[in-house]
């Protein structure tokens, strides 16, 4: 919601297959329609066509959405600490685990590290300031040492160069969620492929 439409002509199946061929570790598929123009059908369309994990990226607020995510074919769900209480994170993540779904907890600040619990698999540090919608990878750098080593760490948003990837790896990041940097390109698949070749 921080920017206008990025790529209205994007073909979901073409792009996701291309990302897989480019050796992406997984796919993040937006299903929120109001703010991002995504849909649940985007997951069902590609589920049987690709063999890498799918993250359903949406505002997950209740158990129904978790059951829905499983039925759509998602492998991973995203819980956003800024949208939930600690208790909700714990309950929803445990519920997700009962369906054999992996859980990413997205955090933006030091305070939200306290939301971590044993049913979280991955911590995603979002580099986007939710108030100003500006991105700064220093957010990931600043929070890296505060996140317990028992969790996988990924850095989200604002990553546009391989140099930033190498820097974040030095701070212990295991993965990176990159969306806009590829999707704003006329050929997202080529942009992804070229980026990964630099790593």
Predicted regions, residues:
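Residue-level signal for inorganic ion chemistry
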Residues: 69, 123, 179
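Conserved N-terminal beta1-alpha1 strand-loop-helix module at the mouth
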Residues: 1-54, 61-64, 86, 95-122, ...
